[in-house]
């Protein structure tokens, strides 16, 4: 391939970058579609040329003319002031330009702001990169073709120096003149402008014999422009290594190696040391000489070395060393800084460690003091300063036993005080009641710590002499303290302590004479204006000793039975009434002499005096009188512990009572102790297996007294009678909806209630118990309230009854009284009462029928005790008021 063909092909390859040529300022040259070159060549000589730019401009103009004449291009040729130029067609470049212009109009889709802001620079760098590669190819081709025409090294070096200040070339353009005509040395102003602006313009390069000077100028010009283009440097190094001749070796001469800088004539560190030492030492020397304190420089060094100790805590020896060293430094003995090997300048590690250890010890002591304070406060009260004490679970039976002991002791004290008052009122003399021990126990129980309670419990279990009564209060305190402490006692210990307390109380308590019993009995009957009735159903034929009676539940503290009468019964739940019992006798007979038992500790029970609706009368003192039992007037045993039925008088089933309290048999706590579990209900109901669960309260006590009744029928009877009680019917609308027009209810409906089914699933047993009741009337498979009460609770829209009116029914015989009762007359309740003789003659029932009026229901629901009718008799207002005053006085005294 000839040099001209190579140059032509190279130019054609590089022609697409013609519109990316930059001027001296780095701006793109806006070339028109048809660019022209000078038409008239002005030959100049290389020797007379003053600048490489002019020579190159002339050469390119001549080559443009030669290309125009020899090989014309299809592009249009236009003539301008500088001459004809050939238009280079570049579709690829135009497409790229159009695409870039559209991109500029739209904006870049890139999210990088750097790409958007440097869009033009990126395009320029791409053009320069391509131009550098093409220029290196062109230069290699030119050197291989122009080897025979290489000029002298001297002229080449001069030309390179003249071209070193030229602008950048987009590529190395090789151009030669058509002949060896000399180039004009003095070009016109138009030619100079052309040299400055189109120094990289595109022109066809197809000379046959290019001159040596022109080639060298172009090569050196491109080399000079490559110095500013970092992309062309690697190509330049390769070119210098492979080119021949001394010219390329001279041009590719590397720069001299960098040498280390000579050391400075002045050492800055020595100069700084000389300048800093007098400034720091000289002003402190005077002050240290006068005051004798260490200089500032020494203090700063000690702080930077990690000095942690305080100067006050240092020893005198270390301080003297520091002062001497500081004084020597202040006197100017040494101009250099003190040595690091001087031990006096470093902090005392041992002393610093002691200071740190002392601080830690102080913190630990503060923490211990705080913990001890919180522990002491936690012992005094259940809630500590910042955190709760650790909770220790306590078995339920221990809590129940402790609560029972505490309640029993307080009740015993109240009974003793009431007994003393009642004896004083009646003129009877009683010995020392021994209330000092309960008083002491009550005072001890309130502020008893857990540790003392535990000790007291052990002593109480060991002692069996007369001093056991004084230990009873401490035992109660221990039971109370177990809820907050960690005391864990066995059940046997609880039972033994309880039995010892009871026995000691029995020994210490005096007995009441029979005359005192008779006097109290007569006074109570006189006060209520009622007489004993011989037809009263006898009590169960068994006796109770003190151990079993002490575990009996008692009434609430400070009030009699009548206060919580209708306190909380909810529909068919536990009966909370303290209503009267079914028999006619208002007070029990034969306290200790039932069935001819003249002596002994028979724990007989009576019923309270009944009001118009079977309500107990406030202020009337009624209580079991048991010699030596410590139970006085004003309180009666409460079978329903912890709020289960507040105040039924205890009539025990014969079988259960005989089994639990027979001769020589275990009773009360002893029975529970033998079983290994303390069961307060064992002393009340006997061995009742079905009520071991705490979730099932015992059923209400029956108001009808039936002797020798087995436990099952005893409980069923009490539950059934509660369903038909005034307290339940006043709230149980569902049960009233089951009544027909005559008040009859299906027995199967009653037997389907959950409490009845928990006792027995047999409907026949339920019917049998209903027949035993004094307040219910049974016919076939129906049951209703007896007497006129059957119509009181019937709803207006009740279904018609399948039974017609019974001529023998008391409701027909007492129709007038029933109508008066429906109208709410006050005398209605009295008119419904019949004597016991009439009942015996008729053989109907052994107990009076309850005749409820509208006012009775209201009084029962509102817990009203100010009734004008007492025991079926209309009292005068003065008498009622006097009775109320007496009741209030006794209650206040008990509280």
UniProtKB/Swiss-Prot annotation:
Residues 95-143, 228-244, 296-314, 359-371, 405-428, 452-468, 485-495, 873-884 have a biased composition (Basic and acidic residues). Residues 31-75, 152-170, 251-260, 325-336, 496-508 have a biased composition (Low complexity). The modification Phosphoserine is found at residue 847. SUPFAM superfamilies: Winged helix' DNA-binding domain. GO terms for biological process: positive regulation of translation. Residues 885-895 have a biased composition (Acidic residues). GO terms for molecular function: RNA binding. Residues 706-796 form the HTH La-type RNA-binding domain. It comes from the Eukaryota. Residues 563-572 have a biased composition (Gly residues). Keywords: Phosphoprotein, RNA-binding. GO terms for cellular component: cytoplasmic stress granule; cytosol. SMART domains: LA. Residues 172-184, 192-216, 510-521 have a biased composition (Polar residues). Residues 24-265, 285-344, 359-590, 796-857, 870-895 are annotated as: Disordered. Disruption phenotype: Sensitive to various stresses including heat, sodium dodecyl sulfate and calcineurin inhibitor tacrolimus. Resistant to tunicamycin-induced ER stress. Simultaneous disruption of CRZ1 enhances thermosensitivity and decreases virulence in a mouse intranasal inhalation model for pulmonary infection. May act as an RNA-binding protein. This is La RNA-binding domain-containing protein LHP1.
């Amino acid at each position: 391939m000839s040099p001209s063909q190579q140059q032509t092909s190279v130019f054609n390859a590089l022609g697409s970058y013609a519109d990316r040529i930059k001027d001296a300022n780095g701006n793109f040259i806006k070339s028109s579609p048809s660019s022209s070159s000078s038409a008239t060549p002005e030959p100049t000589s290389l020797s007379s040329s003053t600048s490489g730019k002019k020579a190159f401009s002339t050469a390119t103009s001549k080559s443009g003319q030669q290309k125009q004449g020899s090989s014309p291009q299809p592009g249009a040729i236009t003539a301008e002031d500088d001459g004809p130029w050939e238009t280079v067609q570049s579709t690829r470049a135009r497409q790229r330009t159009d695409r870039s212009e559209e991109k500029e109009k739209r904006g870049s889709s890139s999210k990088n702001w750097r790409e958007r802001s440097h869009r033009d620079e990126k395009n320029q760098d791409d053009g320069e990169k391509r131009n550098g590669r093409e220029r290196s190819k062109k230069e290699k081709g030119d050197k291989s073709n122009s080897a025979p025409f290489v000029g002298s090294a001297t002229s080449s070096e001069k030309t390179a120096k003249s071209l070193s200040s030229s602008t950048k070339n987009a590529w190395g353009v090789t151009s030669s003149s058509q002949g060896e005509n000399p180039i004009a040395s003095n070009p016109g102003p138009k030619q100079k402008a052309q040299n400055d602006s189109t120094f990289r313009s595109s022109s066809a390069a197809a000379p046959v014999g290019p001159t040596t000077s022109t080639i060298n100028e172009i090569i050196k010009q491109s080399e000079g422009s490559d110095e500013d283009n970092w992309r062309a440097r690697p190509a330049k190094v390769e070119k210098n290594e492979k080119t021949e001749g001394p010219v390329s070796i001279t041009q590719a001469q590397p720069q001299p190696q960098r040498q280390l800088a000579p050391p400075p004539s002045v050492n800055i560190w020595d100069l700084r040391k000389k300048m800093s030492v007098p400034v720091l030492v000289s002003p402190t020397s005077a002050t240290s000489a006068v005051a004798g304190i260490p200089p500032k420089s020494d203090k700063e060094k000690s702080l930077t070395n990690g000095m942690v100790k305080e100067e006050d805590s240092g020893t005198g020896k270390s301080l003297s060393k520091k002062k001497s060293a500081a004084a020597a430094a202040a006197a100017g003995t040494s101009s250099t800084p003190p040595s690091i090997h001087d031990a006096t300048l470093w902090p005392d590690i041992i002393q610093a460690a002691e200071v740190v250890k002392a601080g830690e010890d102080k913190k630990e002591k503060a923490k211990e003091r705080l913990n001890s304070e919180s522990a002491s406060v936690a012992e005094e009260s259940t809630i500590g300063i910042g955190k709760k004490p650790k909770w220790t679970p306590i078995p339920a039976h221990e809590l129940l036993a402790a609560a029972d002991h505490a309640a029993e002791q307080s009740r015993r004290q109240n009974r003793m005080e009431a007994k003393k008052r009642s004896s004083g009122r009646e003129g009877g003399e009683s010995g020392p009641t021994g209330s000092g021990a309960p008083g002491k126990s009550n005072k001890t129980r309130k502020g008893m710590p857990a540790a003392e309670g535990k000790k007291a419990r052990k002593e109480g279990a060991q002692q069996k002499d007369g001093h056991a009564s004084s230990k009873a209060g401490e035992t109660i305190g221990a039971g109370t303290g177990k809820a907050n402490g960690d005391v864990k006692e066995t059940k046997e210990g609880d039972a033994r302590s309880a039995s010892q307390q009871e026995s000691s109380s029995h020994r210490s308590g005096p007995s009441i004479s029979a005359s005192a019993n008779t006097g109290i009995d007569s006074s109570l009957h006189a006060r209520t204006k009622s007489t004993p009735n011989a037809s009263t159903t006898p009590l169960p034929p068994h006796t109770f000793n003190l151990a079993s009676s002490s575990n009996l539940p008692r009434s609430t503290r400070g009030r009699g039975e009548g206060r919580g009468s209708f306190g909380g019964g909810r529909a068919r739940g536990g009966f909370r009434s303290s209503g009267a019992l079914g028999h006619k006798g208002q007070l029990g007979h034969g306290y200790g002499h039932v069935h001819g038992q003249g002596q002994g500790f028979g724990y007989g029970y009576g019923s309270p005096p009944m009001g118009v609706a079977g309500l107990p009368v406030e202020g009337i003192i009624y209580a079991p009188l048991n010699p030596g039992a410590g139970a006085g007037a004003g309180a009666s045993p409460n079978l329903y512990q912890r709020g289960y039925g507040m105040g039924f008088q205890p009539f025990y089933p014969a079988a259960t009572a005989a089994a639990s309290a027979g001769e020589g048999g275990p009773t009360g706590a002893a029975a529970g102790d033998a079983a290994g579990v303390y069961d307060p209900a064992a002393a009340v109901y006997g061995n009742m297996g079905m009520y071991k669960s705490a979730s099932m309260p015992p059923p209400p006590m029956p108001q009808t007294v039936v002797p020798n009744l087995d436990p099952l029928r005893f409980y069923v009877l009490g539950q059934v009678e509660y369903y038909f009680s005034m307290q339940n019917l006043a709230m149980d609308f569902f049960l009233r909806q089951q009544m027909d027009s005559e008040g009859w209810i299906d027995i199967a409906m009653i037997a389907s209630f959950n409490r009845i089914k928990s006792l027995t699933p047999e409907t026949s047993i339920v019917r049998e118990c209903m027949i035993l009741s004094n307040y219910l009337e049974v016919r076939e498979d129906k049951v209703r309230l007896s007497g006129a009460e059957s119509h009181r609770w019937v709803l207006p829209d009740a279904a018609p009854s399948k039974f017609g009116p019974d001529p023998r029914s008391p409701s027909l015989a007492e129709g007038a009284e029933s109508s008066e009762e429906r109208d709410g007359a006050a005398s209605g309740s009295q008119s419904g009462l019949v004597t016991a003789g009439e009942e015996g003659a008729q053989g109907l029932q052994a107990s009076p029928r309850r005749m409820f009026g509208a006012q009775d229901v209201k009084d029962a629901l509102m817990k009203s005790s100010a009734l004008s009718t007492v025991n079926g008799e209309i009292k005068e207002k003065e008498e009622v008021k006097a009775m109320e005053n007496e009741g209030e006085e006794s209650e206040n005294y008990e509280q």
